[in-house]
């Protein structure tokens, strides 16, 4: 959840920088007042403010996709130890029976 908040704050900062500088240094920000287009990774965007809005939405969707992929890439819980303990318990039970 903190990554989502960080991504949102970062996008607002980028938007503010883009509006102040008036140039599309970051893909997708566009020049709202001048009317140039902006796009992220070749995404279609309108002119002016529409271009900036489309670029920001695309940027946020890319960030959300990265966060989702990062969460999926987390290592799974190792079950080898649990399986080993289970086998040892079974072996002890068998030894007790014999």
UniProtKB/Swiss-Prot annotation:
Nacreous layer of shell (at protein level). Expressed primarily in the mantle with highest level in the mantle pallium and lower level in the mantle edge. The keyword Signal applies. One of its GO terms (cellular component) is extracellular region. Residues 1-23 form the signal peptide. Keywords: Secreted, Signal. Its main location: secreted. It is found in: Secreted. The keyword Secreted applies. This is Uncharacterized protein 3. It comes from Pinctada maxima.
